[in-house]
Amino acid sequence: MNVLWLQSAGCGGCTMSLLCAESPNVLDLLAGAGIRFLWHPALSVESGAEVRALLAAIEAGDVALDVLCIEGSIATGPRGTGRYQILSGTGVPMLDWLRRLAPLAGDVVAVGTCATYGGITTAGGNPSEAVGVQ
């Protein structure tokens, strides 16, 4: 099962909690279940051009995307553009990546409170106009 994990606006706490699992070790558990991370920002060694090529291959249909995991809230500001949160190296807002990749995924999983409800990023007047994945 091919899984792409994107981290949007948030602290990465869900990933850190996942990595602290000891019995069983989360990486061994996932591998044993046939789960293959296409990319995870904290677990994968690929970056830059390699990640951009992977995203292009997913969009072209050359790489199957079974599950798209989103960690963190989605910054929609300013004024609905999503430009407050750009996926590094792509020049494309995370909001747009979500819109482009979600229809290609078999399932979309909002990981944690930030991704599901907006989390702490929505506090204090919500200047980034953050929302949950809904």
How would you name each of these model-derived features?
Residues 1-134:
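Iron-sulfur-associated redox domains of electron-transfer enzymes in respiratory
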